[in-house]
A protein has these predicted regions:
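Glycine/small-residue-rich loop that forms an oxyanion/phosphate-binding "nest" at active or ligand-binding sites
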Residues: 77-108
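Active-site beta-loop-alpha junctions enriched in small/polar residues
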Residues: 16-20, 42-46, 72-76, 121, ...
Length: 166
């Protein structure tokens, strides 16, 4: 008798949420939070605010959705899509400050931040610049070694430093 072993695979459906701004409505966030597994929550620098973050965290908790920080350059006018030339210490502060804002809100709901996915120009620049990608990976690891760093897998500059840091 021939037995076939079927491999199981888990797929995580992930979405950028809480991006309320003049560029974007968060009208459908509650509906999306019913179908996603993890949410990248805007931390107020490119979009969103503490009230919006709190709403997303509350609904995420209710639906069992993992909460992630979605840090960006402080660029609400351009929705975080304007490239900026910042020093290493400025980049670290940018990531840490936004993570801490969301973590404080998550904690108030009995939750914690499980992952980080950079937004917009910050993420795009890291895809092209191994030094920036390494700074991001190390900063995220320094925040909490158990936090997942979501990176586009097709970008070598982001995946290599992530493997080296972990």
């Amino acid at each position: 008798m021939l037995y076939l072993q079927i491999m199981s695979m888990e797929i995580n459906i992930n979405c950028d949420l809480g991006e309320k701004s003049k560029h974007h409505s968060n009208k459908y966030d509650p509906d999306l939070l019913e179908i996603v597994n993890s949410a990248n929550v805007a931390c107020g620098y490119h979009a969103g605010d503490e009230q919006t973050m709190s709403q997303v965290v509350k609904i995420s908790k209710k639906n069992g959705v993992s909460i992630g920080a979605h840090p960006s350059f402080k660029d609400p006018e351009n929705f975080g899509r304007e490239r900026m030339d910042l020093s290493e210490s400025e980049i670290k502060k940018l990531i840490i400050d936004q993570y801490e804002i969301l973590q404080k809100i998550a904690s108030s709901h009995g939750e914690s931040v499980s992952h980080v996915k950079p937004h917009g120009a910050l993420n795009n620049m890291a895809c092209e610049d191994i030094e920036l990608a390494t700074i991001l990976a190390k900063t995220i690891k320094d925040i909490n070694k158990d936090i997942i760093y979501l990176v586009p897998v097709s970008y070598t500059h982001l995946t290599l430093p992530t493997r080296d840091v972990v």
